[in-house]
Swiss-Prot record:
Any Gene Ontology CC annotation: cytoplasm
Keywords from the named record: Cobalt, Cytoplasm, Magnesium, Metal-binding, NAD, NADP, Oxidoreductase, Pyridoxine biosynthesis, Zinc
Organism of derivation: Neisseria meningitidis serogroup A / serotype 4A (strain DSM 15465 / Z2491)
Cofactor(s) needed for function: Zn(2+); Mg(2+); Co(2+)
Family indicated by similarity: Belongs to the PdxA family.
Superkingdom per UniProt: Bacteria
InterPro entries: PdxA, PdxA_fam
Subcellular location: Cytoplasm
Binding site for a divalent metal cation: 166, 211, 266
Lineage of origin: Bacteria, Pseudomonadati, Pseudomonadota, Betaproteobacteria, Neisseriales
Short name of one Pfam family: PdxA
Role played: Catalyzes the NAD(P)-dependent oxidation of 4-(phosphooxy)-L-threonine (HTP) into 2-amino-3-oxo-4-(phosphooxy)butyric acid which spontaneously decarboxylates to form 3-amino-2-oxopropyl phosphate (AHAP).
UniProt-recorded Gene Ontology molecular function terms: 4-hydroxythreonine-4-phosphate dehydrogenase activity; cobalt ion binding; magnesium ion binding; NAD binding; zinc ion binding
GO biological process: pyridoxal phosphate biosynthetic process; pyridoxine biosynthetic process
Protein name, per record: 4-hydroxythreonine-4-phosphate dehydrogenase
Length: 329
């Protein structure tokens, strides 16, 4: 089988993205990784970290990099980069990394995209007049013409997808509708089957309220919205269980045999996942017409060029992308 080729965007240049990308040169991965970024920045960061990395220009027709080598698709930064110090002038550079990766997907050069962290605040500071930048997920969805995507984080033996993502807690209940639950669950079911190769994925669903509403005594979202949605989905042949109280759902005996958990909101599901797998977790965007994985952490500006950044999540993100490429065959 031909090795998959992934675009790895190096993210915010002042953060740890370049640092952790350099470690891919020493990770024995069953794929090719083309790091998208400024090769002069990568070289300078390698020197600052004392890492002996040979940078090679990425060539789709070549055989790939040897151990200690890193394939780089050079995209110049707008201005010089100082580790740990954000510069709005380089926000356009960060977005150009994503646009170049998307173009490579369209041209059949890349089999997927793996993203190092970017800094949403500095991008919004730089493009205040051109609209709010929500993040990687929304940007890739918009640019690829994808109407709906689903955020899923994965760690060892645990996958957690979200019905709602970055919403204030006061807005969550109103946002959870029967059509939304059904569409999110369908995307989750489809991608578990077709991108992870799971024939009949079992999905556990969390309730919204304490004790999953206690039969309507602690809220009506379960009886009025969540349960009817699950009944419709089961009639379609989707293997769902729940809704369960979130405080018992994540116990090992409950998770046994489950392929994913569907949580209603961000801080219901992700604290458990991050406690379970922080540093080895992966952010996966479901619903896109291509594979996209990412690290589960931010830019960590204070760690840039210090040698204290952990590349474990990035390496796991690449390994997960390989798993998905194989599962989609």
């Amino acid at each position: 089988m031909k090795q998959p080729v992934f675009a790895v965007t190096s993210g915010e240049p002042a953060g740890i993205g370049p640092d952790i990308c350099l470690d891919l040169a020493f990770a024995r991965l069953p794929c090719r990784c083309a790091v998208l970024g400024d090769k002069h920045l990568l070289r300078a960061r390698a020197e600052a970290l004392g890492k002996s990395v040979v940078l090679r220009d990425f060539d789709p027709e070549s055989g790939g990099a040897a151990y200690g080598e890193l394939e780089v698709l050079h995209i110049p930064a707008v201005e010089a980069v100082e580790a740990g110090k954000l510069n709005p002038a380089n926000a356009a550079y960060v977005l150009q990394l994503l646009d170049t990766a998307l173009a490579g997907i369209s041209d059949g050069i890349f089999d997927g995209i793996v993203t190092a962290p970017l800094h949403k605040g500095i991008i919004n500071d730089a493009r205040a007049s051109t609209g709010f930048f929500s993040g990687h997920t929304e940007y890739l969805a918009e640019k690829s013409g994808t109407g709906q995507v689903v955020m899923m984080l994965a760690g060892k033996d645990l996958r957690v997808a979200l019905v709602t993502t970055h919403l204030p807690l006061k807005d969550v209940a109103a946002a959870i509708t029967q059509p939304l639950i059904e569409s999110v669950a369908r995307i989750l079911h489809h991608d578990l089957k077709h991108k992870f190769g799971i024939k009949n994925p079992k999905i556990l669903v969390a309730g919204l309220n304490p004790h999953a509403g206690e039969g309507g005594h602690l809220g009506h979202e379960e009886t009025d919205t969540i349960i009817p949605a699950l009944e419709n989905l089961r009639r379609e042949g989707i293997n769902l269980a729940g809704p369960y109280p979130a405080d018992t759902l994540f116990q090992p005996f409950m998770l046994e045999g489950a392929d994913a958990v569907l949580a209603m909101y961000h801080d219901q599901g992700l604290p458990v996942l991050k406690y379970h797998s922080f540093g080895q977790g992966v952010n996966i965007t479901l619903g896109l017409p291509f594979i996209r994985t990412s690290v589960d952490h931010g830019t960590a500006l204070d760690l840039a060029a210090t040698g204290r950044a952990d590349s474990g999540s990035l390496i796991t993100a690449v390994e997960t992308a390989v798993e998905m490429a194989r599962g989609s065959l």
